[in-house]
Amino acid sequence: MNFKATSLNRIVTSSVAAVAVVLSPVFAAVAQAETLVGAGASFPAPLYQRYAREVRKTHKNLQVNYTSCGSSCGIRNFVKGTVDFGGSDAAMKDSEIAKVSRGTILVPTAGGAVSVVYNLPGVSNLKLSRQVLPLIFAGRITKWNDARIRRDNPGVNLPNRRITPVVRADGSGTTFIFTNHLSTISGYFKGRVGTSKKPRWPIRGARKGKGNSGVAALVKRTSGGIGYVNYSYARLNRIKSARVQNRSGQFVAPSLKAANLGLSSVKFPANYRVFVGDASRGYPIVGLTWMMIYKKTLH
């Protein structure tokens, strides 16, 4: 089916209803006061906290707790059976699903944008082209006044300062979405880094933060820093976000409207696993997040 919400707010609202339907057998099996435990991606953590509040309205004795520990952590705990549900911004692989004896249901719960955040005092509305962005995170462009960056930012006083990339320390679905985009638009990046939840970054002097919040905090206090976080974390921390060039050649800043345009052409296959490598409209670095639920409960 097509991903045709008019805004990400509608996506969130509809996904609450969708998850409630999928989780209904789990809730029905709860016969007494109980706690359901989830863990995984930090990307959807605020949304899943909202789910918990909605669930509590109709299931008074049920407490739902979600720990933000990264997508790799979410998949790992779900496969081990140490949680009741998991969260990941990278859909589980067939090999991972095969390890779950209780069966797996993947529910795409929301979509969102990955912002490229930076810390350059005096520089606003930074533009990063499809040629430049992959080379920064592949370690090929190392100075802010590189001619290739200056070309897209005429009249901007870019400093002769080393670029300090900030990446995730943990296995991350946000990293998966980001590297999937860079691998799609750059053959060099694909060969050098590739698409991964936890790649081996070939960047000298890169700093690492745990979770979206950790990356946001590091960029905020690192002059010359650049990183990638979920759009909501960029807004929450009031960090400047670059305008990123999409496939149509437009430089677009992340926003709910721009992310929705980027997601508007998504078509879901039967297994709901779909990845947006390079959106032609709106903001180009977008992706989905999934909730992982067991087909068979233990109750």
Question: What do these predicted ranges mean?
Answer:
Residues 1-10:
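N-terminal secretory signal peptides that target proteins for export/translocation
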Residues 19-30:
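C-terminal segment of classical bacterial N-terminal signal peptides
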Residues 15, 24-25, 260-262:
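Short, flexible coil/linker elements and helix-boundary hinge sites characteristic
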Residues 32-299:
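Flexible loop/hinge segments at secondary-structure junctions
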